C-alpha cells in the first residue's frame, strides 16, 4: 500500500468501514516486502551510511534523505521515481523508510510463539497434542510421527526416545514410516488438517459423549477448528517460513554525542535471527552432521520466539545493562505500548500550559490568557490577518512583525481572539467537566486566570496547579466548543443533575455574613418603605449591614426563616405580599436588590444563606428562569460574596476557639461511668469484649457531648450578636467541619491503633490546650495512614474509572424508542425506617412505562412521558408508593440504548439526544467521586469515628403499630420477644397508609403490641447491639446434649475477675453436635450451639419463653477505613465472589437440620411438594434459621455477605440488578456523594448482556460459550424458523474487566488489557472489527461515532437557498486553505531554493 509520490497524499485512506485481522501467509509477507534482508549489519562505522542488504539498507527501505539516492548520483526532485543504477536506491521521500517492509527467508520453518505458547495453545488444540509434547517436538527433543506406514504407531504420536525412533526407522522406513522433529514436522501435520471435517467429527463426538470432562475438551478443540473453518486462515500459517522486517524508522538507530549509538532493541533481536539463519544456511550447504544442524535450528527457533515475544518461552534475552530486550509484543503491551501511548493518547499541537491564578473579575464564560501564550498559539491566524489587512505581503514579513512584537500585532491579536473560544483542561480529567471552553481575555503576566466558580468542576485550587490550553482550529470545532462546551452552558453536573458551579469558600462566607442578622446593631428595628431607602440609609451610616429591620414590600416573598428546612430554597413556596412588612436585614435587602438585576420576577429571598442554601438557590433559579438568568445571577453572587467576605474582615485567632466551661466536669463523669463498667466486668456481669465495646461507646458519646456543648455555646454567643469567625466558617459551610472544630476546642476523642482497633483511652485534650507527648504519639499514626492511603487509593480509583470507561464506551443513544414493554419498579429507599431517598427524587427525569394513576384513578403521568419536577411532586402528593419506569436495564436496543429508556440528560435537564455517549458519562460519574472517596481521610486526621450502634427504634410519626410476619413469645417480664428474622413492624396513619417500616432483629424486645396507638418518639423496639443471643421459645428444664467439659465446652477463666463462664468450642469428633434441649409441657425443642457461644444457663435449670440460652459476642468494631468502600465498589463491579459468602436457599420451604460431616453441617430445606435441597454450612458458623422455620427462596441460612452469582441463579436478573444498584449506591451515599441510578444501571447493563450456552441445540454455538443476549436470541429465532431446536442458556454476569475483553471489537479489547491474548484469538478467528465503538475509531484516527460524529447527523441535506450560501462559504474556505497550503510550501522550500524567495510575492 506504499506510495512514493508525495502528491498522492491527498487521497484518503480513512475511507473504510471495517478492519480485519488474520494470519499472514508466506506469499502475503513476500508481497509486502521490498527486498530480503540478508546481512545483520546496520550502518557503516566510517561513513554512517546504511549497509547494503543490511537492516537499514536504503535499496530495500528507501533513501535516507529526501530526493537523493545513496551514492549521490541523483539529487533534487526532478529525478522523482528514478532507480539509481549504481546503488539501486529509488529517488523519493525519505519518509518511505517509515512504511516499507523487508523480509527474512528462514532456512528452516519456525513456529510463531503466540500460537504455540499462548494459552490455550492453538497449535496443540488443532493437532490434539499436549503443550509439553508440542514443545519437545518444536525444540528438537522428540520426534512426531508424520507417516506411520506399517509401524505400530499412530500419526501425531510423539516419540521421545531416540533409540525407539532408530529401531522404528530402520524397520519400517521401506513401508513409508516417517517421523520428523521441529517446526517442519508440525507444519507437515498442520497442512493435513481439514478444518471442515474436523469440525463435523468433533460435533459428532460431542453428541455421543457422556463424560462432561471430555465434552468440554471437545468444545475447546471445536472452538479452534471452527475459527479456521469460518476464516480464510490456513493452519500451516501458524508456522513461519518468512519473517517480515518492520521499517527502519520504526526501530531507529540514533547517534548520541561521543560517537556512540542508541538503538532500538528490535535491531538486536533481528540481528540474532539473521546471524543464526545465515549460519544455518551455511551448515546445511556443508551437509553438516544432523546434531549440529538441529542445534542451530533450535537456536533459530529461540531467536524468532524472542523477536516476537521475549520471555514467553525460555530465558529472557537481556541487553547490555541486564535489561530485558523489548520484543514486538512488548511494543504493543501496557501503558507505554503502541495502543495506549501513541494511539489513544496523542500529544497535540496548538496547546500550552501554565500556572493558574484566580480571576474574580471575569465573567463565567471568560478566562484570562497570557499575551505571550496567545501570540504563540494564534500565530497562523495572526499571519493570515496581517496579510489580509495589508500590513505585510509575505509570510516571512508577517513572521518578522510578530517576532519584533510590533504594536499593530497586539491589535490584530485582540481581533483574532474575539469569538474564538479556547479549551482549558486540568489533569487529572476525571469527568467531562475537566475540559471546558472559555472566551479568552488577554492578560499581562504569565499565568492563566480562571473564574472562581469553575474550580469545583476542575477540582482546581491555586496552590500551584497548572492547566493546559488548547485551540480549536476548524470552524466546526469552534462552533462545537462555543455551543456545547462553554463554561456557562455547563452549570449542571452530569452525574446528579445538581448545579456544579456553586459558590464555595470566600463567596459562601461573604453571602452568609451578608444575610446574617446581628441583634443590637445600629438602627435595629427601623421600618423602611422600599429597598432604595434601605440602601440610602446604609450609605448614610444610619444602619449596618447586619441590622435587623422591617421592610414594606410588594411582590413574592420566599421566607426561609419560617420554613421547615431553612436552606431548602428549591421547595419553599413564595408567598405574594401586598405592601406588607417583612422582618429582614439590611444585608438581605442588598442581596435581593442585586438578585433582581438578573430578573425582576425573582422573589424576595429572606433567610440566612449557607452553602446548601446557595446551591439550592442556583438550582431554583435554573429550574424557574433558565440558563441565561442563572449565569447572570451566579456572577452577581460571586461579586457580592467576595465583596462582603472582604468587608466583614473575618479572621481567626486563638481566642476564637472557645472551650466549653464544663468540659472537665463532663469528662470526669465519663471516667466514673467507665470505672463502673470496669467494676461490672470485675464482678463477672459482662465479658471483656462487652466491656471494651461499652467503654468505646461511652467515650464516643462523651466526645459528641463535649462537641455539642461547645457548638451550643458558640450558637448562644452567635444569637447574642457576638460573631465567632470559626463558628461562622463552619456553620456557613465555607471551610472546616464540626469534627475539625471539635478537635480544635472540644476534645480529640478516640484514636485508632495501626491494627485498626480503637484505643479505649481517648485524647481528652484539644489542639487549643495542646497534647501531651503520649497523646501526640497516639495521633501520629492516624495522620500518616491518611496520607499513605490517599496516594494508594487515588491509583486504585483511576484504574476503576479506566475499566468502567472501557466496559461502557460503546453505549450510545442509538434510537429514540426501542419499543420495550418491560421496565423496573422504583420506590423510596428506606433504611432503618428513615426515608433516605424519596420516590420523587428517584423518578425525576425518568420515563414512565405505564400510566401512573392516583388512588382515585386519575392519570398523573401518561405512558412514555418524562417525569418532570411538577409531575414528580404530583406523584408524591398522591401518595403513590411505587411506579414502573423504563430503564436501560430493560432496553431492547441491540446496540447502545434508546432515549426513552435512558430518560433525561442530567447535564441539560432535557430528554437525552441521539448520539449522546451515555456510557462514558456513566463511567466518569461513577469513577470521579471514586477519587473523592479516596481522598477523604486527609482532613479528619485519623480520629476514630465509629458509627455508634443503634439499640432501639422510636416511632417517627403518630399512628398505629402493626406487626408483619413476626413470631413472638411473651417473656416472664410480660413484654414480647421476637423469635424470627424476616419480620417487620410498621406505623400506619389514619388513612391506612404505611408511614414507616422497620425490620426487627431476632431477640429484640417489643415495647408495643400489635394494633396499639403509638406517639411520635415512643420507643417501640429495644435490643442489645453488641451480642447475638439464642433464645428459647418454650419454657421448661434445660438439658445439655454433647456439651462436655474439655470436649465441646471449655471454661474461660477471666484473669482479671477470676470468674469463669462456659464457652462452646469445636470438637475434634464431628459426630458430636453441641446443643441445648428444653423439655417442657409443650414438648421438647433443640437449639444447636455454634462455636464461641457463651452459655448463659446451667444444666437442669428452669427457663421461661424468651430467656437467653447463650450469647455470641459480636466482633469488636474496627474503624471504617476511607476506602470509602472503594474496594466494595470494585468487588461489586468485578462481580467477584466475596470471601466466606452466605449460603442462600434456592426454594421456599421448611428448615430441617442434618448431621455434620467433614467439617460441614448439612441443612435441608423441604418444599411443600416434598422436594428437598441440601446445603452445607461450615461447622461452628452461626446459623440464621431455626429447625422447623419457614423460609423463602433467596433467604440467607447463615451470616455473611451475599454472592451476586447466587442471587442471579436463585432470584433472577431483576433482583440482581436492583441488588447491585442499591449496594453500589449505598457506598456512595455514606460518603455523601449524589449519583443518579441511571449511571450505575448503564454499567450493570453491560455486565449482564451475556448468556452462557448450556445446550447447543441446532445452532452454531459451542457448549459453555458465552454469547451476547441479542445474538443468542437472533440465532435461536433463525434455528426455530428453519425447524431446528433452539439453544438453551442461563444468564451470566461478567465483571467489568471480563466484559470489556469480551467485546466484539478486538481493537478495543486489545487496547484495554491482555493485548497478546486478544490479538492471538482475533487473528485465528479472522476477526472483523466494524468500528462501532468509540475507542476503535480513536485508534484508527476517525471521528468517534457519538455526538456530532454520529451517522445520524452526517449527510444532512440543506434547502436550495441554504445550499447556495453553503457553497459560497465552502469556496471561500477552500480558497483560504489553498493560500495557506501555498504559504506552507514556500516555508518548506525556503531552506533549499537557491533563488531565495524574497522576490516571490504571494497575492
Curated annotation (Swiss-Prot):
It holds the Pfam family RNA_pol_Rpb1_5. GO terms for biological process: DNA-templated transcription. Its cofactor is Mg(2+); Zn(2+). The keyword Thylakoid does not apply. Keywords: DNA-directed RNA polymerase, Magnesium, Metal-binding, Nucleotidyltransferase, Transcription, Transferase, Zinc. Binds 1 Mg(2+) ion per subunit. Binds 2 Zn(2+) ions per subunit. The keyword Nuclease does not apply. One of its GO terms (cellular component) is DNA-directed RNA polymerase complex. Gene3D superfamilies: 1.10.132.30, 1.10.150.390, 1.10.1790.20, 1.10.40.90, 2.40.40.20, 2.40.50.100, RNA polymerase II, clamp domain, RNA polymerase Rpb1, domain 3. Mg(2+) binds at residues 461, 463, 465. InterPro entries: DNA-dir_RpoC_beta_prime (IPR045867), DNA-dir_RpoC_beta_prime_bact (IPR012754), RNA_pol_asu (IPR000722), RNA_pol_N (IPR006592), RNA_pol_Rpb1_1 (IPR007080), RNA_pol_Rpb1_3 (IPR007066), RNA_pol_Rpb1_3_sf (IPR042102), RNA_pol_Rpb1_4 (IPR007083). It catalyses: RNA(n) + a ribonucleoside 5'-triphosphate = RNA(n+1) + diphosphate. Disulfide bonds: none annotated. Residues 1391-1403 have a biased composition (Acidic residues). Residues 1384-1403 are annotated as: Disordered. Zn(2+) 2 binds at residues 818, 891, 898, 901. Zn(2+) 1 binds at residues 69, 71, 84, 87. It is an enzyme of class 2 (transferase). Its EC number is 2.7.7.6. GO terms for molecular function: DNA binding; DNA-directed RNA polymerase activity; magnesium ion binding; zinc ion binding. The RNAP catalytic core consists of 2 alpha, 1 beta, 1 beta' and 1 omega subunit. When a sigma factor is associated with the core the holoenzyme is formed, which can initiate transcription. Belongs to the RNA polymerase beta' chain family. DNA-dependent RNA polymerase catalyzes the transcription of DNA into RNA using the four ribonucleoside triphosphates as substrates. This is DNA-directed RNA polymerase subunit beta'. It comes from Koribacter versatilis (strain Ellin345). The lineage of its organism: Bacteria, Pseudomonadati, Acidobacteriota, Terriglobia, Terriglobales. The gene is rpoC.
